Regions:
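Patatin-like phospholipase
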Residues: 1-8, 16-179
């Protein structure tokens, strides 16, 4: 089994669950639950959607940040990870997200040896579920996640395959899968 994991977007959920110490069999159950009852974890931004069409038709500024708020999915992810912080991860972990304000990649990690990377900032202070949700917030679909001073979206915007970031965080040999 790996001693370090990284993931972007949906991969951040797999990486975060694994890093939380969840057995693979339980991860499979969680994914089946999400697949079978996915609508239960979606919370559409109805007020934003209702304002979208009139604003579009009248040429006014559109303020809809995403069709789905993401709060219900975040709650589910927090439940699955038992509210653990990054530093409670059982393996080295890297989860990238992108800050809409600066354009930089923000990497959530528990690695104390994360090395400098151009246009990358590292943070150690977050809940696993927050990092997973931020990295999974596909722009236009999910609203960006506000964490501290950052406004975060899907890490795949800049790092679709985060193997290099995992290496920069001090991981040994890296096997990367890009799907």
């Amino acid at each position: 089994l790996p001693d370090a994991v990284a993931g972007t977007s949906a991969g951040s959920i797999a990486a975060g669950l694994y890093a939380s110490g969840m057995p693979v069999s339980e991860m499979e159950k969680a994914v089946r639950q999400l697949a079978a009852h996915g609508n239960d974890y979606l919370d559409p931004d109805y007020s934003g959607i209702m304002e979208f069409v009139p604003r579009l038709l009248t040429g006014r500024k559109i303020s809809l940040q995403g069709y789905i708020k993401g709060d219900k999915l975040l709650s589910y992810l927090c439940e699955l990870t038992a509210g653990k912080q990054l530093d409670e991860s059982v393996v080295k972990l890297v989860i990238p997200a992108v800050d809409l304000i600066s354009g930089q990649t923000l990497c959530f990690t528990n690695s104390e040896t994360a090395g400098a990377q151009m246009h990358v900032r590292w943070t150690w202070d977050a809940y696993l579920c927050e990092a997973m949700m931020a990295s999974s917030s596909v722009p236009g679909i999910f609203a960006p996640r506000k964490i501290g001073s950052w406004l975060l979206v899907d890490g795949g915007v800049t790092h679709n395959q985060p193997g290099g970031l995992l290496k920069a965080a001090g991981a040994g040999p890296v096997i990367a899968v890009d799907v």
